[in-house]
């Protein structure tokens, strides 16, 4: 606290002890005083600490093979997509490492950004791939839905709201947000409604594609801090999108017909080989996708040009769905086993039960996303009863439980203890 000097009512700074005559300004608080020099010093310390914490570091950037191996721990299948994503992400952050799009001191080559387009049906892991990448690299990550976006000035969300989600994910640390990853889902829903340009304005289709162009390429965008529409009397957050990696995904229903028409029957003459539509399944067809197919689908050339990396994810078959249930680090079976373990009960699935769950997911057409819903339905009654019972040691889920809603097998605690004792005696 400031003290009075010998010469009268002379106030002193509570921090450095200088009198009001020795400083330019002395600011009073409730019982304390601070001088302008101490304020400047505090500002310097804070700015130094913030600049150190803000600067994202990519000194130990994992190699593409390491990125792919990390994805293998969480994502089953989709080898082509994982390889393409690993290379694209590595090149993107290597580009940031050497100074972004600026030219290096010993080279005149300018490194451009490579955004990614993921094509594939629902429930195949498009969103999960992007989430897992962001978690590995420890960068801010945001998911946006393209169906909610409209052109500026119309009812709906502006494209800048996507950037606000990323800033919020980075705790409003703009420097960190500028090296983050944004995943835009349902990108196929903003395709132009007709192949020919129309006189009527397409505010949720082509208009949104036009609005996204600059953000995808790299620009300094003005983002309203509270979201919503812009108005001239509000402050904006300035964010540079040059080093933000955009991954966009969509199911692109009907695109396979456009690809088939291009690669289908091209033969001419008696000796030409004709490739019928039956020769290729949907996964094979999508693997032949070209930018021209996306243009026919309704994406504008400028938009497709800003997504140089195009890769596909395939529908999950029965074997892949069973592996998803059991193999990843956070596999669904392990999650539910852990939940039961907290009630001191073992949960067991027979092989045919897992096959039945996978078959149900295929029938519903929901892919891996539907597995949890099926598991919840199967385990609902037993999860309701088990916490209130102390006599159950193990719950066994069989095929009949999944398909016919039969009660699961409950193994009493006494029999489990007796078996364990017999085993110990024989040993």
Curated annotation (Swiss-Prot):
It holds the Pfam family ClpB_D2-small. It comes from the Bacteria. Keywords: ATP-binding, Chaperone, Metal-binding, Nucleotide-binding, Zinc. GO terms for cellular component: HslUV protease complex. GO terms for molecular function: ATP binding; ATP hydrolysis activity; ATP-dependent protein folding chaperone; protein dimerization activity; unfolded protein binding; zinc ion binding. The keyword Metal-binding applies. Residues 1-54 form the ClpX-type ZB domain. SMART domains: AAA, ClpB_D2-small, zf-C4_ClpX. ATP binds at residues 121-128. One of its GO terms (biological process) is cell division. Zn(2+) binds at residues 13, 16, 35, 38. ATP-dependent specificity component of the Clp protease. It directs the protease to specific substrates. Can perform chaperone functions in the absence of ClpP. Component of the ClpX-ClpP complex. Forms a hexameric ring that, in the presence of ATP, binds to fourteen ClpP subunits assembled into a disk-like structure with a central cavity, resembling the structure of eukaryotic proteasomes. Belongs to the ClpX chaperone family. This is ATP-dependent Clp protease ATP-binding subunit ClpX. It comes from Acidothermus cellulolyticus (strain ATCC 43068 / DSM 8971 / 11B). The lineage of its organism: Bacteria, Bacillati, Actinomycetota, Actinomycetes, Acidothermales. The gene is clpX.
């Amino acid at each position: 606290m400031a003290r009075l000097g010998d010469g009268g009512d002379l106030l002193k700074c509570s921090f450095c002890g200088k009198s009001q005559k020795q400083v330019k300004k002395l600011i009073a608080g409730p019982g304390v005083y601070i001088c302008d020099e101490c304020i400047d010093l505090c500002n310097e310390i804070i700015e130094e600490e913030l600049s150190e914490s803000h600067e994202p570091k990519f000194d130990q950037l994992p190699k593409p093979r390491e990125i792919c191996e990390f994805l293998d721990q969480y994502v089953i299948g989709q080898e082509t997509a994982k390889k393409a994503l690993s290379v694209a992400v590595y090149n993107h952050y290597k580009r940031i490492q050497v100074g972004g799009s600026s030219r290096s001191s010993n080279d005149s080559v300018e490194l451009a950004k490579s955004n990614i387009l993921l094509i594939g049906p629902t429930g195949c892991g498009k969103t999960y791939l992007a989430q897992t990448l962001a978690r590995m690299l420890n960068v801010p990550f945001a998911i946006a839905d393209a169906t909610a976006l409209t052109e500026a000035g119309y009812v709906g969300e502006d494209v800048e709201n996507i950037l606000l989600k990323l800033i919020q994910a980075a705790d409003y640390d703009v420097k960190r947000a500028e090296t983050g990853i944004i995943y835009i889902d349902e990108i196929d829903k903003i395709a132009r409604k007709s192949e020919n340009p129309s006189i009527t304005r397409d505010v949720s289709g082509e208009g949104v594609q036009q609005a996204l162009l600059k953000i995808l390429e790299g620009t300094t965008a003005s983002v309203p801090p509270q979201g919503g529409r812009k108005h001239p009397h509000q402050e904006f957050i300035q964010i540079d999108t040059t080093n933000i990696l955009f991954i966009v995904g969509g199911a692109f229903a009907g695109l396979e017909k456009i690809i088939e028409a291009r690669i289908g029957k091209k033969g001419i003459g008696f000796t030409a080989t004709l490739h019928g539509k039956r020769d290729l399944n949907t996964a094979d067809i999508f693997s032949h996708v070209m930018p021209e197919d996306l243009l026919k689908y309704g994406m504008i050339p400028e938009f497709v040009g800003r997504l140089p990396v195009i890769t596909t994810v395939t529908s999950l078959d029965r074997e892949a769905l069973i592996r998803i249930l059991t193999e990843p680090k956070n596999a669904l079976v392990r999650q539910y086993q852990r939940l039961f373990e907290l009630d001191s009960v073992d949960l067991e699935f027979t092989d045919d039960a897992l096959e039945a769950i996978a078959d149900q997911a295929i029938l519903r057409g929901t892919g891996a996303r539907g597995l949890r819903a099926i598991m919840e339905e199967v385990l609902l009654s037993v999860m309701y009863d088990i916490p209130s019972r102390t006599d159950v040691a193990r719950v066994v889920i069989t095929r009949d439980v999944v398909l016919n809603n039969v009660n699961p097998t409950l193994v009493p605690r006494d029999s489990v203890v007796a078996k364990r004792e017999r085993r110990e005696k024989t040993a």
